[in-house]
Design a protein with these regions (language model features):
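Long, contiguous binding/interaction regions
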Residues: 1-48, 57-187
Length: 187
């Protein structure tokens, strides 16, 4: 089966232990999570999980359905890279003496539109925002010059490229149902 990198976006209420429940769905199916980012969403009280994993379409559909069944999950959807806009951030700690001695290092940093955010006599810190591939390529080119001391990257953050936000519609529908039930109780 062909494996594709899928991004699952989960919206949930903010309850302790839910992250463990969500990751357990992947563990039970022996699917490795490539990146995981959890943060507050644009809706108060709702958190957004952005999870990436390599798998096939049938498996990602099953995983998404299992996650959706969790009590505190409002909704979960999976996407391919052409259905989302995604970004990461990376920090590269490089040796300042090599940065000063080899002009290629500065050229590579400029080529990838990265920026130097800290410089001292021992090391410099380079920051790169962008697509996963660009971040990896910059790392590989800097590593080839033997100047990388440390490297760290964030998990993927993503938004859908569709014209609507599914969670907003879901919450509006949920609120309308709640109000109707309250009105019926008042009758």
């Amino acid at each position: 089966m062909d494996k594709t990198l899928y991004t699952i976006i989960v919206h949930s209420e903010n309850f302790a232990g839910l992250l463990n429940q969500v990751t357990a769905v992947f563990t039970r199916r022996q699917i490795n999570i490539e990146s995981l980012n959890v943060s507050a969403s644009s809706i108060k009280g709702v958190h957004k999980y952005t999870i990436t994993a390599w798998t096939d379409k049938d498996t990602i559909e099953k995983v998404t359905k299992q996650i959706t069944k969790k009590i505190d999950v409002l909704q979960a959807h999976y996407f391919t890279d052409d259905e989302i806009y995604q970004h990461e951030i990376a920090l590269y700690k490089i040796t300042t003496p090599i940065l000063e001695e080899k002009p290629e290092v500065s050229k590579i940093i400029r080529k990838y539109n990265a920026r130097i955010v800290e410089v001292n006599p021992v090391f410099s810190i380079v920051e790169k925002n962008g697509m996963s591939e660009e971040i990896t390529n910059l790392y590989e080119e800097l590593s080839a010059l033997e100047c990388v001391l440390q490297f760290v990257r964030s998990g993927r953050v993503a938004i859908t490229t569709s014209c609507f936000e599914r969670v907003n519609e879901y919450l509006a529908d949920r609120e309308a149902k709640y109000r109707r039930s309250k009105e019926q109780e008042g009758l």
